[in-house]
Curated annotation (Swiss-Prot):
This protein's name: Glia maturation factor beta
Record's GO cellular component terms: cortical actin cytoskeleton
Post-translational modification: Phosphorylated; stimulated by phorbol ester.
Keywords: Acetylation, Growth factor, Phosphoprotein
Residues with N-acetylserine modification: S2
Length: 142
């Protein structure tokens, strides 16, 4: 089984984009959506979005194809503080082709390590990506 697990590399320009994204100064929500180029076996940029809420973000995700998302979220704490956690979200909808799911699942950890992220979440249905869901997930870290 392990020999069929494909681990894709991360495109060089995407590595640089993720590094810059980590240190961005803007105070709005933003997302980098990534996909796998299966011929090149590379994780590549799909879209970059600024000023996007979790609910708007879910509308950008394909319902039948996996995607990786790095999301900078303006998190308002109960005590009034504001932070901007970087979240990694693996969208792996039910109904994806099994080989596609395997390729994404096999490449997820490498991408998380490359992007140096600790807040890693997974959704199986794009409808699950809501502000409430994200706040609940982030609540475990704060």
């Amino acid at each position: 089984m392990s020999e069929s697990l494909v681990v894709c590399d991360v495109a060089e320009d995407l590595v640089e984009k993720l590094r810059k994204f980590r240190f961005r100064k803007e105070t709005n929500n933003a997302a980098i959506i990534m996909k796998i180029d299966k011929d090149k076996r590379l994780v590549v940029l799909d879209e970059e979005l600024e000023g996007i809420s979790p609910d708007e973000l879910k509308d950008e995700l394909p319902e039948r194809q996996p995607r990786f998302i790095v999301y900078s979220y303006k998190y308002q704490h109960d005590d009034g503080r504001v932070s901007y956690p970087l979240c990694f979200i693996f969208s792996s909808p039910v109904g994806c082709k099994p080989e596609q799911q395997m390729m994404y699942a096999g490449s997820k950890n490498k991408l998380v390590q490359t992007a140096e992220l600790t807040k890693v979440f997974e959704i199986r249905n794009t409808e699950d990506l809501t502000e409430e869901w994200l706040r609940e997930k982030l609540g475990f870290f704060h």
